From Swiss-Prot:
Belongs to the universal ribosomal protein uL13 family. It comes from the Bacteria. CDD domains: Ribosomal_L13. This is Large ribosomal subunit protein uL13. GO terms for biological process: negative regulation of translation; translation. One of its GO terms (cellular component) is cytosolic large ribosomal subunit. HAMAP family: Ribosomal_uL13. Pfam families: Ribosomal_L13. This protein is one of the early assembly proteins of the 50S ribosomal subunit, although it is not seen to bind rRNA by itself. It is important during the early stages of 50S assembly. GO terms for molecular function: mRNA binding; structural constituent of ribosome.
Length: 142
């Protein structure tokens, strides 16, 4: 018996909606990353993008445990000397709540062209509304 390898043109992709309200950041991010990779499917192939589309709503209401709300820092660099910037979780949640989930999930995906293709299937929204109703997404409980 030969090992099954999924072909990119035969992969079927579904759309799912995840409500992040009251959920812990790491626990929701690991499940989203796994679904984006397609590891929940029997036809999973590591070098083929077999994952589904994920829509995350209520990103502004995601939680972290312990003192991470005040202590967890996010860093960015402009590329110029002395150009490092830092912002903590609370301020980033008030300013750009989508970026918190995007950054957590992106770090869990493979690096390179395949990981970037997987990341493009993630849609994150701060509020409860999204504009993907035409895709008829299913609700995913995490």
């Amino acid at each position: 018996m030969k090992t099954f390898t999924a072909k990119p043109e035969t992969v079927s992709r579904d759309w799912y909606v995840v409500d992040a309200e009251g959920k812990t950041l790491g626990r929701i991010a690991t499940e989203i990353a796994s679904r984006l990779r397609g590891k929940h499917k029997p036809e999973y192939t590591p070098h083929v993008d077999t994952g589904d589309y994920i829509i995350v709503i209520n990103a502004e209401k995601v939680t972290v445990t312990g003192n991470k709300a005040a202590g967890k820092m996010y860093y960015s660099h402009s590329g110029f000397p002395g150009g490092i910037k830092e912002i903590n979780f609370e301020k980033l949640q008030a300013h750009k709540p989508e970026m918190i989930i995007e950054k957590a999930v992106k770090g869990m995906l493979p690096k390179g062209p395949l990981g970037r293709a997987m990341f493009r299937k993630l849609k994150v929204y701060a509020g409860a509304e999204h504009n993907h109703a035409a895709q008829q997404p299913q609700v995913l409980d995490i």
